[in-house]
């Protein structure tokens, strides 16, 4: 049976708000519904949440579930990176749709930097990520897939996630199973783990789901389970 990625990776919304302006943005709708900040297009930083990183029980954290890394002020990023360095028991993920706006180096061993790609025309984001963010770990999220991305240069990428449209617009967008399988085959050829999100079950079948995590994430989950015994 397929698993939900949210059971493996916890959101930590240190920054809320995004300047990208995607039409299908679930985060913007949630912020408006719950009145989290005044203006979603003007991101806010919540440094008090950094204390969550001090927990000893290891976690895999996504830090950009309600933001885009390109919209973080450099001083916010520096403060978060410093806290990440102090807490090697966790793994931390970042995502951006605008890697062209980033330019930094980091030697953090437990930080993963990724881009979202929804269509072939956005493949440039992968190259921009490798060029502009000089880091130890890279990942790519192909979600929601609007068309066939074709042949993808995944060199240097350590993990990919594949998914389709969810929520109210899910009936308007149809991801073909061949697109997901093509990405999976390309990644596996390079030894890259693939995680198919649970929303693909209706498209490719639960028995065909591939849900692989990087070894670093698996180690965190193993320690979590040992703490629960």
Positions of predicted regions on the chain:
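Active-site-proximal loop/turn and secondary-structure-junction residues that shape catalytic pockets
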Residues: 67, 98-100, 117-119, 144-146, ...
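Structural alpha-beta junctions
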Residues: 86-92, 134-137, 184-194
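Nucleic-acid endo/exonuclease domains
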Residues: 72, 142, 176-177
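Short capping loops/turns at secondary-structure boundaries
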Residues: 118, 122, 173-176
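Auxiliary Fe-S-binding modules of radical SAM enzymes
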Residues: 1-9, 146, 151-229
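Long, well-ordered alpha-helical scaffolding segments within enzyme catalytic domains
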Residues: 79-82, 129-137, 174-186
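Hydrophobic faces of well-ordered beta-strands that scaffold small-molecule active sites
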Residues: 61-63, 92-94, 111-115, 138-142, ...
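Conserved Radical SAM active-site core
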Residues: 1-112, 120-134, 149-154
